[in-house]
């Protein structure tokens, strides 16, 4: 088990959080990242000191190591560029499988929590997925594809991350 110093984590989905159905920005013909949503994410990070860990399908070709960034696809590159534009960066991503077993989104989060020292975490996602089955709904701030991340979500996320501080 890899344990580092205790940290706060934002498990971040992208679609329906950092973009909406009406987002004009595009990435390879698909909906890209809405720059108007980035200040909301930045506020959460600034007020909690949390790190961003991807749970989104946007993580598929995202690379943590600088020397592997050339392997990234357009989605991962856009994510890095947009986050960097407001002083943010992705810290890590959840695993899709371990020991040959594929994970659900919830299981990927539980695996991450098992291998890292996390003091508090929040999940920003527009879908429920299997979070209730893994007893993670108390940490879920559920957005929607119409509005994405809003000030109300920001307030709730900060409360969850700073609980007990």
Over which residues does each language-model region extend?
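Catalytic phosphate/metal-binding cores of nucleic-acid and nucleotide-processing enzymes, i.e., regions
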Residues: 2-165
């Amino acid at each position: 088990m890899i344990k580092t110093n205790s940290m706060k984590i934002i498990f971040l989905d992208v679609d329906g959080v950092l973009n909406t159905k009406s987002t004009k920005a595009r990435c390879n013909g698909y909906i890209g990242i809405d720059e108007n949503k980035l200040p909301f994410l930045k506020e959460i990070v600034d007020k909690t000191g949390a790190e961003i860990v991807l749970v989104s399908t946007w993580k598929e070709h995202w690379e943590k190591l600088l020397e592997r960034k050339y392997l990234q696809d357009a989605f991962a590159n856009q994510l890095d560029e947009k986050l960097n534009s407001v002083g943010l960066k992705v810290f890590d991503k959840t695993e899709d499988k371990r020991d040959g077993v594929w994970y659900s989104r919830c299981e990927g989060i539980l695996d991450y929590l098992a291998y890292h020292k996390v003091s508090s975490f929040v999940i920003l996602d527009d879908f429920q997925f299997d979070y209730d089955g893994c007893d993670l709904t108390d940490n879920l701030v559920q957005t929607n594809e119409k509005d994405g991340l809003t000030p109300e979500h920001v307030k709730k996320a900060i409360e969850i991350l700073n609980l007990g501080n």
